């Protein structure tokens, strides 16, 4: 019956949320446990076998920093606290944040950090010809993928919101005194959710390195950034979870050092509507609805996490062919794509990172 079908869909969404909460709890362990095996001399000559590790809930996800350099624990705590600092700059929903004030026309003067990240977001919006668009905020706020009862927004609301999506109408300027300004039409809403975690990870890495950390792993809910090597001439091993796997199965194990691994896909946040239709969180700025894609996961290997964060989403929205074409045009970037049928695509040198 219709009621039974609705109850089935409700139960499936509840089960997904339970699994999502559990996966958030174990995500850092899954990825970082792989980096701790075997338990021998992880790091440089003066590093620890068992890392100084702190886990906290920040940025709506579980954050873990594990330092194999023997530093005071207060350094790790201060590094994690940077998540709060940057959330108060980049959050679209936090009323006290700088971006919230920009979106609500409370200010046109912006900080160096917000200027830098918006500029980066606009660069990738241009690179994708608008397939990725940081002004998607007017649409993304209609879709609440974190709700206990998510639903599809009314079509008229989506249609209206699309009138306020166009990255080309955002202008950044800096005056002779070095003060940054932003200008965009009323009703526009910038959403930096697809790029902020990578930027924050890079800033945390800089802080840790400046404080003497030579070997560490930063994990911001799956955005993984390594500092240095596991030990001299030995890479870290990063396990990339297979999309939609309930058993913790890995898509790949990657050997990397002093680099970033970032994945984006349809499995991160999604729900099923009353008729059983699958909706994921990567929205098309042209239609206002989730992208219909042959891809379910894009994993980027890069030196900087900001680059990986931006490219993982950009390549997903471009699709397999154009996304891989973009990767091949960039120096120092590798990618692994997974299609919905389980087929994996590798950029030219991506396989060199795969653990044999």
Predicted regions and their residues:
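Single conserved hydrophobic/aromatic residue that forms the stacking wall/gate
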Residues: 1-11
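Mature catalytic core of soluble alpha/beta enzymes
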Residues: 13-356
